[in-house]
Swiss-Prot record:
It comes from Bacillus cereus (strain ZK / E33L). HAMAP family: Pur_nucleosid_phosp (MF_01627). Homohexamer; trimer of homodimers. Phosphate binds at residues 20, 24, 43, 87-90. A purine D-ribonucleoside binds at residues 4, 162, 179-181, 203-204. This is Purine nucleoside phosphorylase DeoD-type. Keywords: Glycosyltransferase, Transferase. It comes from the Bacteria. GO terms for cellular component: cytosol.
């Protein structure tokens, strides 16, 4: 048992999916997993373990933003020995050729968060995904005929941004999309020597205003979850 997770030892699998929304964690468990048990309800941040294609997998809500996901990733690794962590969530596209419903796999993540500068004063640490997980997820996506993009994303500390100037500059440098957690996940995975990946669906385009319908979001979300689960059980 840790501060924010009430699971007993052995109740959490070595491979885990990390949606921000705890209700998405519940949806994933109920829709994709078999023999499901709920191991956590502290602060309503639900966690479940079950099997997918006969292999144990867990799913844990993390909340939104760098501070929140950092809490859960630290505890999952340090207290429960989790080895493979895959964030599943949504993002906003900032490239013209990235469309809503595309799947983005984050190879790395730049950020406006000060998280890493507190650890590396005067340096810009560049956290990266685990290549084996990335390749497995990419292959799973392309086999399903999905439009999968691999590249850099922005992990933002601010959701309601007053100025988009920096986001536009990052787009000029090839950043694909904006989300709020990947930098923290990849940095902590590097610190503890475990494997991490972010698989994201494009829910909207920040510059064009294009958005997905709720039905489109759910369909694309399901495809993303299958990609993540297929990668997780092969690791």
């Amino acid at each position: 048992m840790s501060v924010h997770i009430e699971a007993k030892q052995g109740e959490i699998a070595e491979s885990i999916l990390l949606p921000g929304d705890p209700l998405r964690a519940k949806y994933i468990a109920e829709t994709f997993l078999e023999d499901v048990t709920c191991y956590n309800n502290v602060r309503g941040m639900l966690g479940f373990t079950g099997t997918y294609k006969g292999k144990r997998v867990s799913v844990q809500g993390t909340g939104m933003g760098v501070p929140s996901i950092s809490i859960y990733v630290n505890e999952l690794i340090q207290s429960y020995g989790v080895k493979n962590l895959i964030r599943v969530g949504t993002c906003g596209a900032i490239q013209k050729d990235v469309k809503v419903r595309d799947v983005i796999i984050a190879m790395t993540a730049c950020t406006d968060s000060n998280m890493n500068r507190l650890t590396f004063p005067g340096f810009d640490f560049a956290p990266a995904a685990n290549f084996d997980l990335l390749k497995k997820a990419y292959d799973a996506g392309t086999e399903k005929g999905l439009h999968v993009r691999v590249g850099n994303v922005l992990t933002a500390d601010v959701f309601y941004r007053e100025s988009m100037d920096m986001v536009k500059k990052l787009a000029d440098y090839g950043v694909l999309a904006v989300e709020m957690e990947t930098t923290a996940l990849y940095t902590l995975a590097a610190k503890y020597g475990v494997n991490a990946l972010s698989v994201l669906t494009v829910s909207d385009h920040i510059f064009t205003g294009e958005e997905t319908t709720s039905e489109e979001r759910q369909t694309t979300f399901n495809e993303m979850i299958e990609i993540a689960l297929d990668a997780a059980i092969q690791q």
